[in-house]
Design a protein with these regions (language model features):
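Flexible loop and strand-edge segments within Gram-negative outer membrane beta-barrel domains
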Residues: 256-309, 313-314, 329-355, 396, ...
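Transmembrane beta-barrel wall of Gram-negative outer-membrane proteins
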Residues: 204-228, 235-268, 298-315
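Coil residues (strongly favoring Ser/Thr
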Residues: 27-28, 38-39, 46-47, 52-53, ...
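Exposed, low-structure sequence patches enriched in small/polar residues
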Residues: 143, 305-333, 352-689
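Short acidic/polar hinge/loop motifs at secondary-structure boundaries
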Residues: 105, 135-162
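A beta-strand signature from Gram-negative outer-membrane beta-barrel systems
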Residues: 149-195, 205
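Extracytoplasmic beta-strand/coil segments of soluble accessory domains associated
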Residues: 57-59, 66-70, 95-136
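N-terminal periplasmic "start-of-domain" segments of outer-membrane beta-barrel proteins
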Residues: 31-89
Length: 689
């Protein structure tokens, strides 16, 4: 890894030599999902299709393939997060991008590669559907997804679906859905793009994209990336390799065939948090670690394969069609005390496998006054899971639709939608409505409500249920389908120098399956293995203010979320409030050859319930934690970062970040301390071959 980064640094130096003047540069400080206006009045361009400033080359015109049908089509309120909105910002993975989105929070475990839980609306593992190009990419038996495995540089746009409609689009009826759309249009010449960064503890990231037209109708692309970090604490190292391939073929102006393949391989050491000899604050000395447990001897291996064949067609007038065939397989190997070196640590050697074959068909019919969107999904999954001591099969068939009335003025656009889901032999449903529109050219609104049922997953069906509280271990009941109600209302405003959004949501889930830890042996004296599930009711409501302001060459961005429900009502651990913001100075220097952006990033996080994770199953446990540790509420925290980036000729961006400038010692997840003050630098460089 060090040799690779040394070579990359040589490449960075050559950027300064070969840079050429470019008069039209892009400001990418637009807040994700909300339009800002920079007083510099520059155009927003995609760095992969930008024209050469010295010549107007026809070869730079992109190949125009049929675009992917967005889930939020004909939606004038919820905006996509475009890649060029964050490509020059400071991010390691998509969790850093989501930080500035309404009701979003990352349960950060403090080190690169650790399986952080990304939360939306106070919901995380088991409640969020990640949809890539129309296909659910969640682990089918865990019903979760680790964002470290996604290739960030292939993203074209992201849509965070309102909580009222999250159940609608995939094979799982999860309350929250995030749709990630890949890029399809590229310049008609070969391109190479490099992004890398390096930081303390030998943390490094290298990503290379190569894309080339073979003919006017055929494009091929290849992406390879490597991420790694050495152990900051004993047994906390991580390395990941990703390989992605893409083929786009234009059968005609009205029909395309797109094939994509994604592979990832991860090796992750699970160190279990900080032991007492690393803690400087005596308040944490109640965490009892024995000397023999300093190295937990836990690690996780993952291999993931995903292939997707997509046919996009505009053959029938007024109808856009999307037919996808997909295959997903995941191999997870979980090891704990494999060699039985420690008598007081249970030996766990589990191989958990699954594979899924499926198809998805979508028709979007659009006329002048009406839009009708229909989606049908079918998939079959086979499981071989040592952790559940179970080999089984799961079939899912879903049919959903949305009917929307369109008007010329866009002042009032009502819609109704519904879904039927035959999930492994059980029929569940969901339906709702929404109204959106524009009050004038500067203000728009949204209102949505829904009722839907959520499935019981393969994992939940293989655990005992104890529905009473306090838990009666003699009373066992079958898992119940949870009943969910959701509402969301928002106002968006957009003026010359001020823009923002105010959003309120209310969510209720009855009979929700919640994991419980109870009298379970473990490796670190922190209970981190699920014993059974219990039924709980979840009540959550909150308000978000996403506010942006431009003054001279200063840009202000703030994302404030506040939850009205108590910590116990929310059930899952999440902060009472969060504030994430940026203050940047931007300017063009050196005859517009350098675009400078510099300032601060800050995050204020309120306290939350104590909790632990079962990493093998991707479950958060807040109830019945071990009595051997005196758990208290996770305290509030504040982190301040310094950030500076310079974009040269719109071809290369060099960035430097000083993280945790105040060198604050804190944690978000007990007891995974965040990194101390560290320096991180890198470059993103676009080449034309």
């Amino acid at each position: 890894m060090k040799k690779i980064l040394l070579i990359v640094q040589v490449f960075v130096f050559s950027i300064m030599i070969y840079a050429r003047p470019l008069t039209n540069c892009a400001d990418t400080l637009i807040n994700k999902g909300i339009n800002n206006y920079d007083t510099l009045k520059v155009a927003h361009l995609d760095s992969l299709v930008i024209n050469d400033s010295t010549k107007n080359r026809v070869t730079n015109v992109p190949n125009i393939f049929i675009p992917f049908i967005e889930l939020s089509a004909k939606n004038n309120y919820h905006e996509r997060i475009k890649k060029n909105n964050f490509s020059k910002d400071d991010y390691r993975n998509l969790s850093d991008v989501f930080t500035y989105e309404p009701f979003s929070f990352n349960q950060d475990l403090g080190s690169l590669g650790q399986p952080n839980e990304q939360m939306f609306y106070g919901l995380g593992f088991g409640n969020v559907s990640y949809i890539s190009d129309g296909v659910l990419i969640n682990n089918r038996w865990q019903n979760s997804y680790n964002l470290n495995r996604y290739s960030n540089e292939l993203v074209d746009s992201i849509e965070i679906i309102p909580i009222t409609k999250g159940f609608l689009y995939s094979t799982y009826n999860n309350p929250v859905a995030v749709s990630i759309n890949s890029r399809f249009n590229y310049p008609m010449r070969a391109i190479t793009k490099l992004r890398f960064f390096q930081a303390s503890y030998d943390e490094g990231f290298v990503d290379v994209i190569f894309h080339s037209p073979i003919t006017k109708k055929l494009n091929v692309g290849l992406n390879i990336s490597n991420t790694a970090i050495d152990s900051r604490f004993a047994n906390s190292d991580y390395e990941s390799w990703k390989l992605n391939a893409q083929i786009n073929y234009q059968l005609s102006d009205k029909m395309n065939i797109d094939f994509s393949y994604h592979y990832s391989n991860d090796t992750l050491a699970l160190f279990g948090g900080l032991d007492t000899n690393k803690m400087l604050n005596g308040n944490y000395s109640t965490v009892l670690y024995e000397t023999i447990n300093k190295k937990s001897a836990r690690y996780l291996l993952n291999n993931n394969n995903q292939a997707n064949l997509k046919i996009l067609a505009f053959v029938i007038p007024n109808i856009k069609s999307d037919l996808s065939f997909y295959f997903i397989s995941t191999s997870q190997k979980y090891f704990q005390n494999e060699g039985q070196l420690f008598e007081n640590i249970p030996r766990i050697v589990h191989g958990n496998y699954y594979q899924t074959f499926g198809m998805s068909f979508r028709n979007l019919y659009e006329q002048k006054y009406i839009s009708f969107d229909v989606i049908a999904n079918y998939e079959t999954s086979t499981f071989k899971t040592d952790v559940l001591n179970n080999n089984s099969k799961q079939d899912v068939f879903t049919f959903s639709g949305e009917l929307k009335y369109l008007t010329n003025s866009d002042r009032f656009i009502p819609a109704v939608y519904g879904k039927l889901n035959r999930f492994n032999g059980k029929m569940i449903y969901g339906f709702g409505f929404e109204v959106m529109g524009k009050i004038d050219n500067h203000i728009s609104y949204y209102l949505g409500m829904s009722l839907f049922q959520q499935q019981t997953t393969h994992m939940e069906n293989n655990y005992l249920y104890h529905s009473t509280f306090p838990y009666d271990l003699t009373a066992v009941s079958p898992p119940q389908i949870s009943e969910n109600r959701a509402a969301e209302v928002g106002i968006k405003f957009d003026y010359n120098f001020v823009s923002g959004k105010i959003t309120y949501f209310n969510y209720k889930s009855l009979n929700k399956a919640v994991p419980i830890g109870f009298m379970t042996k473990n490796d670190s004296l922190l209970v981190n293995e699920v014993s059974f599930f219990s039924e709980r009711n979840i009540y959550n409501s909150g308000i978000n203010l996403n506010f942006n302001f431009v003054l001279w060459k200063l840009l202000f961005n703030n994302n404030l979320s506040y939850y009205f429900s108590s910590k116990t009502e929310r059930v899952y651990a999440s902060p009472d409030y969060t504030l994430a913001g940026k203050i940047y100075y931007t300017n063009f220097l050196f005859e517009n050859n350098l675009y400078l952006k510099t300032g601060i990033n800050y995050r204020l996080t309120a306290g939350q319930l104590p909790f632990v994770y079962d990493f093998e199953k991707s479950l958060q446990i807040t109830a019945n934690l071990t009595p051997m540790v005196n758990y208290s509420e996770v305290p509030s925290s504040f982190q301040l970062d310094l950030f500076m980036s310079g974009t040269i000729q719109e071809r290369a961006t060099i960035f430097v970040t000083i993280e945790n400038v105040l060198d604050a010692e804190y944690y978000i997840v007990p007891y995974y301390f965040k990194q101390p003050m560290t320096l991180r630098f890198g470059v993103s460089w676009l080449l034309y071959d």
